[in-house]
Each structure stands twice: as structure tokens, then as C-alpha cells.
């Protein structure tokens, strides 16, 4: 679901391309590459990488999710053993949570050592950016930050995205229920649409109560879920940081209105 990039710090590092984000919003991936490159990273996309296996893992399809994950493990291992990697950078937190769990997922399988090595260098893009010299800026827009469950609870990354947005000059606010789910939750919005819809309505209401210019999030699933319920533009955190440091204005800011949520085909 994410895009992952591997980066070597020229500071080298790397990234990866996830399946849903590639289809739903390629601007996020483009912004990630631009920003990391601008900050001195050598960004590469490992040949053979693909879906992290998160969605099928959520659905209990263990064999299918492990087969998908194994392709990534092999692809990244080739890079690690080749020119080397400092990090596997992931810009969708739902995928990041899964990749960081590869060591546990494969603990009793032949790829156990390789899976543990991959999981050990997997990082959310906000973790990487906190280690780089992101310049200060003075953007000024009021941004309501939505903390994805997979980021704040799954990965225990609670402050980095907000710190980075503040450094870029955005006025950051949060909804009163910032610790609660928006209802996307992997495949939950597909399997339990009624309850998911209630969670979405509550989250949209509390975000709109902050009267922001922009809503920011770090997970494509949350962005699609919340964006389908509000006219306030919702933008990935990395797109805002890219814009603040010289990149293009995010396209979502010029296309307000509720976004239709595409329904994926789940085998």
C-alpha cells in the first residue's frame, strides 16, 4: 500500500513503491523522492519490490501475505548485500507497520535473518526527515494533523510529523479525538462499512472544528477515508514539506471538494 524507497545516505537510503498509493496518489511518491533528494539522499527503488502484504495480512490470508512480503525481502536484501542501504523509507504508515513486523512474521521461516535485517532498517519518512537538515520555512497555513493509528499506535511515532510541519512554518492543530481511529483501518472500511462510516463522520467533525486551511496525514487509507467526507483539502505530510522546501504546490489544494473513494478488488 505504500511507496517505499530505499535510500543510501550521501547520506544514502532507499525507498519502496507500494501498490495502493501508486494507483491512488502518485504525487506522494514524487514528493518523497524530491524531498529526500533535495536533502542529500541517494534514493533508489529496488527492482522487484511491490505490495508489502498488509491488506491480505489484515484479512488473515497468511500464505498470500507472506508470499508478497517475501518478494520485498529478497529485493531489499539484494540491495543491502550490493551497494548497501541505510534505510528503507516508507511513506504510508499502514505499510510501514507491516514491514517493521517482517522479522516477527518470518521468525520461523528460512528468510528469518533477511526479514529481521529488512525490518531493522525500515523507517517512516518522518523518522528519516528528523535526522536530516530540513530547512526552516514560513508557510503560515493552518494545518489540522490527523495521526494515523498505524503511525501513532502501531509505530509509536507521535510527534515527528507535527514537529516537521511546525519547522516548515505551518500552524499545527489537532482534533480533540486525535488518539482515535478515522474508520479506515486497513480493510475495516470495506468489511464493516456502517461502523467505519460512523468513525469517519466523528473524525471529520472534530477535524473541521479546528477550522484548518489543510488537513494533513501520513497514511493513504486515512486520506481517502477522511477526504471522502470533507471539502477541506487533505494532503500528505511529505507533500507539504516538499512544497515548503521548494517543491510544487500540492494539487489537492487546487481541487477542493469531497473525494470519491475507489473500492479495490480483494481476492
Locations of regions flagged by a protein language model:
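Iron-sulfur cluster-binding electron-transfer modules in prokaryotic oxidoreductases
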Residues: 1-267
Amino acid at each position: 500500500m505504500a511507496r517505499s524507497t530505499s535510500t543510501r545516505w550521501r547520506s544514502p537510503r532507499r525507498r519502496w513503491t507500494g501498490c495502493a498509493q501508486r494507483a491512488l496518489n502518485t504525487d506522494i511518491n514524487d514528493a518523497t523522492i524530491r524531498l529526500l533528494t533535495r536533502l542529500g539522499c541517494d534514493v533508489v527503488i529496488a527492482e522487484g519490490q511491490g505490495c508489502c502484504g498488509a491488506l491480505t495480512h489484515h484479512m488473515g490470508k497468511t500464505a498470500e501475505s507472506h508470499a508478497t512480503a517475501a518478494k520485498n525481502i529478497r529485493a531489499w536484501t539484494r540491495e543491502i548485500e550490493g551497494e548497501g542501504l541505510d534505510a528503507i523509507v516508507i511513506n504510508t504508515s499502514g505499510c510501514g507497520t507491516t514491514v517493521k513486523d517482517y522479522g516477527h512474521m518470518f521468525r520461523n521461516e528460512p528468510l528469518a535473518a533477511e526479514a529481521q535485517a529488512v525490518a531493522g532498517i525500515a523507517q517512516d519518512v518522518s523518522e528519516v526527515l528528523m535526522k536530516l537538515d530540513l530547512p526552516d520555512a514560513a508557510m503560515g497555513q493552518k494545518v489540522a494533523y490527523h495521526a494515523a493509528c498505524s503511525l501513532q499506535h502501531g509505530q509509536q511515532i507521535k510527534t515527528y510529523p507535527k514537529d516537521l510541519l511546525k519547522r516548515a512554518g505551518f500552524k499545527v492543530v489537532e482534533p480533540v479525538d486525535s488518539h482515535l481511529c478515522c474508520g479506515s483501518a486497513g480493510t475495516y472500511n470495506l468489511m464493516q462499512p456502517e461502523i467505519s462510516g460512523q468513525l469517519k463522520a466523528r473524525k471529520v467533525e472534530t477535524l473541521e472544528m479546528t477550522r484548518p486551511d489543510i488537513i494533513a496525514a501520513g497514511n493513504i487509507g486515512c486520506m481517502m477515508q477522511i477526504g471522502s467526507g470533507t471539502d477541506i483539502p487533505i494532503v500528505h505530510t511529505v507533500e507539504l514539506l516538499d512544497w515548503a522546501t521548494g517543491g510544487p504546490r500540492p494539487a489537492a489544494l487546487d481541487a477542493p471538494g469531497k473525494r470519491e473513494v475507489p473500492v479495490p478488488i480483494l481476492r
